[in-house]
Each structure stands twice: as C-alpha cells, then as structure tokens.
Amino acid sequence: MKKLLDKWISISLIKRIIGGLALGIILGLLVPKASGIALFGSVFVGALKAIAPLLVFVLVISSLCHSGKSHGGVIKTVIILYMFSTVLASVIAVFTSKLFPVTLTLTEGFEEMSSPGSIGDVFNSLLMNIVENPITSLTKANYVGILAWAVVIGIACRHAKESTKDMLVDISNGLSKVVTWIINFAPFGIMGLVFDTVSNNGMSVFKEYGKLLMLLVGTMLFIYFVTNPILVFWCTHKNPYPLVFRCLKKSALTAFFTRSSAANIPINMKECEDMGLDRDTYSVTIPLGATINMDGAAITITVMTLAAANTLGITVDIPSAILLSILAALSACGASGVAGGSLLLIPMACSLFGIPNDVAMQVVGIGFIIGVIQDSVETALNSSSDLLLSASAEFRQWRKEGREITY
C-alpha cells in the first residue's frame, strides 16, 4: 500500500489533476446520475476551507513573533500592485464593454435579495469584519478579522518566551503538512467538482448567454495574460510569462474548480514556499489578496452594469464610465465581505446610472445563471493573481538586492 501511495505522489501533481479533470468530464457525460462522485469534490473543498483559516491565523502569528526585520517594503509593494491591478481591471472592462456592447434578456421572474445600498455599506461591513471576535472570525472564515487579530497577537508575542515561539513554529509546520496531504487529494476533488458541473449544467449555459460570457471571460483573460505580465515585468525586469504560466498551472487551475479564493489560500501558500519566498511576507499577502485583490470581481461588476445600461438604452459617457471604474474597484475590494460576492454589488453600481433596483436584481439573477463559468474564471483570476503579484513584489526586492531570480 505504501509503495502504491509513493508511486502516486511521485507523479506530477499537474498530471494527476489533468487526469482527474478528464475523468470527471467523462463520468459527467456517461453517468450523470451517479451523484456520489460529486462527494469527492465537496470533501476536497470542505477540507481546504476548514484548514485555511487556522493556517493563516497561526502562520501570521508565528511569522510576526519571530520577525526581527521589517517586511513593510515588500508588503507595501504588494498592496499597491493589488489596488492598481484592480482599478486597471475595471478600466479595461469599461473599454471592452464599449468595444463589444452586450444587451440582456430580462424577465419578470427573479428572487429578491439583499444588496449593499452604498459604498459606505461595503466599507462599514469591512470595518465590522476587522473588529469581529477572533474565534467567530475563525469559524466564519472572515479573513479580514483573522488577519487583523493575527497581526495584533503576533506583534504582542514578539517578547514571548522562545519555547512559546518554537511551539508556534511547530504548529504552523504541522498545519502546512496537513495542507500537503489535502493537496495530494486534489485530483479526486477536481474529478468530483467537474463531474458535478458537467452532470448538472452540461453545455446549456453557453447557448443563451454566450456573448456575455465571452465578454466577461475575454476581459479576464486579457488582464491575466496582458496587463498582469506588464506588472510582473516592471517588478522583475525579466520575461514574465514563465511565472504567469506557473501560477496558472499551480493556482488558477484549482481555483477554477473550487470557486473559492479562501479554499485556494493553502495552495497559494504552498507554492510560495516552493518558490523560496519569505514566509513572513507571503503569510500576510496571500490571505490579504484573497480579501482585497479582486480583478475578476471588478470586471464582473463593470461589465454587468454596463450591459444593464445598454439594455435600457442608457448612454454612459466617459466621465461616468471612469466613475464606474473607481466605484467597481472600491466595491470589489469589499466583495469578500458581502454575501453573494461581486454579483450582489451590481445593484449598487447600477444605481450610479439610475437603473431601477428590480432591473438590477434581474441582472444579478442572470449572473447566478452564468456563475458556473463566470464565477469559476473570476476566482481563478483573483486567486492566481494573489500568487503572481505576491511573488513579483518579492522578486522586485531580490532584484534590488542583486539576488538571482528564478521562476
């Protein structure tokens, strides 16, 4: 049994995942009624979501209480990259929406949902998440609260006994080992997730909303393969695409199927470790990115809002479009703190153009219909960009120090 397990682990993870992906598609088409297969996906995502909050909490405390040097410069660079890329994504989304305008088929039937009334509501939600009880934050996977309390406790523990610090290191190493075990289960998890998607949705989602999906996905791909590499080149002064494709394989692929930035945090952290990045830095920037680095969310909010405006015959001028870009970027940063994520921030953006709330909620309903594709690509972009930009910022520091940068 041990030999079989060792043989399994010796195979490249990406090859195992591709195998699971192919098997999931085949089973979804041949035996769509075999619902038990989907359980593998549920267990995989559940395990990642369960370990991620604890991993982030312990890693950040352990890193900060041991840290004798400042990592503020790298972290500051990462935050700037996160914010700039999100604003840039919303601006690009405005241009693509203008170049390829899309209208929507609205219906009367939709389910009323609660959405934020203003940008103030979004930031109020973020502020309340920061000061939420740390135990509650862990159980609810509130990463803003987890990060805030972990930073405070980590700084306070800098004067703790060495035995206490060593214990925290041992716990963080143990949790990292558990993450490795879970990641080795990824091929089965991906198989279950793909099976569930194919057996329940088939290809029908492409037929009715194909043009809208092409606009959303095309814009997201443009950000990942064109604008993000420019940011990487600015940091490293090297060909960015080896790093771009590494992050695509190691992070975007799993994020696409889990559809959860939180579940992908352990995977991104493991890849940062494999790249030789500083744990004191990435233990903060990766979970922070899962909260505020929301290129995909900014694109979704912008494209869906402009599609609603086109449908109602509302002309959006350049100043209004710029204002929408800023609003979408700021809103996207709070998407993780809103139930329903980016889709439920659409009504707030629609209000900028006087679009009635009932129409805006129908647009949200369309968003949920295409979510099987839109949300998957959005999460893949968001999560892989966390890894890409975190690595780029640290490589920028390496370049300044004269260290060799290898992808």
Predicted regions and their residues:
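Transmembrane alpha-helix boundary and packing residues in multipass membrane permease domains
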Residues: 25, 55-62, 94, 151-155, ...
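Membrane-water interface of transmembrane alpha-helices in multipass transporters/channels
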Residues: 36, 40, 72, 203-211, ...
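Transmembrane alpha-helical segments and their short flanking loops
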Residues: 303-407
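Signature of multi-pass transmembrane helix bundles
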Residues: 8-30, 42-48, 73-242, 406-407
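Hydrophobic transmembrane alpha-helical segments of multi-pass transport and channel proteins
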Residues: 47, 83-87, 91, 217-221, ...
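Active-site-adjacent helical/loop segments in soluble small-molecule enzymes
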Residues: 44, 50-59
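Juxtamembrane helix-boundary/capping and inter-helix hinge elements in multi-pass membrane proteins
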Residues: 64-73, 159-163, 200-201, 237-240, ...
